[in-house]
A protein has these predicted regions:
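Conserved functional hotspot residues or short segments at active or partner-binding sites
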Residues: 350-357, 361-558
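Structural motif
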Residues: 130-132
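Polar, glycine-rich mid-to-C-terminal structural blocks
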Residues: 297, 309, 316, 320-380, ...
Length: 558
């Protein structure tokens, strides 16, 4: 009798368990239908009765943005006119002239060429960094944003456009005819050899061509440069196409290795991604460089190679994006890029740092504290943790840049000086040999003074806030001597600060100048001349015992 009762209870529980989800789905569908009906009626009523005319498209898009931004930063609506941006992210291709443009200033100063790409139509037509775009064909660009100008410049390959530009230092404008081409942006802008025999490959982002580009770079380094170890640099790489990350891991681990699994609301769409290609090399010592801007697909590569004990990681903790997005078709040729799942790397951990499902009362998102993370184990039994990104095996922090550099960059002092400098120097030595002279640095100081460059330290702003607090509490007069001394100490001395931060300023200026001659490749060469993270990687790879010991299973505790 008791067994029969238990069986009956279990049957009822199973029945309830089956009914509750169905009821929940039914209730949820009703809520969706009800709120769509309300929204539809609301838009009609506002459009009909609001006292002024309304741009319905803008109003609805603001509503869409508000709804999606409350979910996470990665779920977004992509209207038809922005589909080219999605294509660029996934393929690295677009129809245009091949140049980076940017807004100059914040007061409608126009849009300028920031960086032509090597070998692309813009560079071949003679466009240079600093050129102000006045018009594209018959459209005046005055007052337009960089996004608006970008849409004018992009188009169907092999179509012609005419640009009118103003070159700094010239009174007359220039008219330049350009034929748009299919622009393919490489994701491996630079690779080379460092130390005695260590290959270096920089990957800027992940498109559907990245794996092939990595393969070609690696094979060139191995066959023609005879490298014995390899560094893959993922610093600043915000991710991209997931499948490319899996393919890159597959080049260095045995075929059939699990790289990630994805889990979402729709269980039928859960997937396990395994390597499907024959590896290029499974034994060569390998280091991966990461930092706080290494995210998503970068973390799949770094985390996968760490969990499989195939590479040592060097740098600082990665961003912590453990979410996967996929596009969904929408009416009128739009798309919804929606977060559909979380991903888990080989040890079983999810490295998502921010918990978007549990927001604070003010709507902000909290990071998962280290105390709440869990321990997982690599293939060799090394301890790793979930949440909060990927932690490197060797911590090495990039030096902080002085605030003065931010203002020199934001006020276009370095950019404009480099433009002026390049107009006076037709050629420069190879990027590997280029150095900025002290005379050039003094010329920069004079240039900044001529432009009336000044800046405010953050410490000065904080001091003013502290004075306000002291005034409120009635202690300002009593502490006036102390505040005066601090104010004197913290008042920016531009001349002094130029000399104090001379090495850092010269470094950034050298990069800005070299780009004018050797493009992104030259920029990379200059940046790597004194890179402490790369130097640490070279040290670890050169110490074979340290490298092996780092990846080895821990000794069992007695």
């Amino acid at each position: 009798m008791q067994r029969k009762a238990i069986t009956s209870v279990l049957f009822l529980l199973s029945l309830i368990a089956g009914v509750l989800p169905l009821q929940a789905q039914k209730d949820n569908r009703f809520e969706v239908s009800k709120n769509l009906e309300i929204f539809n009626a609301l838009v009609k009523e506002v459009e009909m009765f609001y006292v002024d005319s309304i741009d319905i498209e803008k109003a609805v898009r603001r509503g869409i943005h508000a709804m999606l931004s409350g979910l996470d930063p990665y779920t977004e609506y992509i209207p038809e006119e922005n589909m080219g941006d999605l294509q660029l992210i996934t393929t690295g291709e677009y129809g245009g002239m091949g140049a980076l443009i940017r807004q100059r200033g914040t007061s409608g100063e126009g849009v300028v060429i920031a960086e032509p790409y090597e070998g692309m139509p813009a560079a071949l037509a003679g466009l240079k960094a600093g050129d102000l775009i006045l018009s594209v064909d018959t459209t005046n660009t005055s007052g337009k944003t960089s996004d608006e100008v970008s849409r004018l410049l992009k188009g169907i390959p092999n179509t012609k456009m005419t640009l009118v530009i103003q070159r700094p230092g010239e009174k007359k404008t220039r008219k330049i005819d350009i034929v748009r081409k299919q622009i393919i942006i490489t994701t491996v802008p630079y690779y080379g050899v460092y130390g005695d025999s260590t290959g270096y490959i920089y990957l800027s982002n992940f498109t559907d061509k990245s794996a092939q580009e990595i393969k070609e770079a690696f094979e060139d380094l191995r066959q023609n440069k005879h490298i014995e170890s390899l560094v893959i640099d993922l610093r600043g790489n915000g991710g991209g196409v997931l499948e490319s990350a899996v393919q890159i891991v597959g080049m260095f681990v045995p075929k059939g290795s699990e790289v990630i699994s994805t889990k979402g609301k729709i269980r039928q769409w859960d997937r396990i991604y395994r390597t499907s290609i024959e590896p290029l090399d499974t034994v060569m010592p390998l280091a991966v460089l990461i930092n706080g801007n290494s995210a998503s697909a970068s973390e799949i590569v770094a985390g996968g190679l760490q969990d499989l004990d195939r590479a040592v990681l060097i740098g600082s903790r990665s961003f912590g994006k453990g979410l996967v997005q996929a596009p969904r078709e929408l009416p009128y040729d739009g798309k919804l890029k929606v977060t559909m799942s979380k991903y888990y790397i080989p040890s079983g951990r999810c490295i998502q740092q921010l918990d978007y499902t549990h927001r604070k009362a003010d709507g902000s998102v909290a990071a998962i504290p280290d105390s709440l993370t869990s321990v997982f184990y690599t293939a060799n039994g090394r301890q790793v943790r979930d949440g909060g990104g990927i932690r490197p095996d060797f911590e090495a922090e990039e030096p902080d840049l002085p605030a003065m550099l931010y203002y020199l960059t934001n006020d276009n002092i370095l950019f404009d000086f480099a433009t002026d400098w390049a107009q006076k120097h037709i050629t420069i030595p190879p990027a590997e040999d280029f150095t900025l002279s002290d005379d050039d640095f003094e010329a920069l100081k004079a240039f900044a003074k001529e432009k009336n460059f000044t800046y405010d330290r953050q410490s000065t702003k904080v001091l003013n806030q502290l004075k306000d607090v002291a005034r409120f509490e009635g202690y300002l007069a009593e502490d006036s001597t102390l505040f005066s001394a601090l104010e004197t100490k913290l008042t920016p001395d531009t001349e002094h600060d130029f000399d104090r931060f001379k090495p850092e300023i010269k470094k950034i200026l050298a990069v800005e100048i070299i780009k004018r001659y050797y493009y992104q490749r030259g920029e990379m060469i200059e940046n790597l001349k004194s890179d402490i993270i790369l130097e640490k990687a070279l040290q670890v790879l050169a110490d074979k015992e340290l490298y092996i010991q780092t990846l080895r299973a821990p000794e069992p505790q007695p």
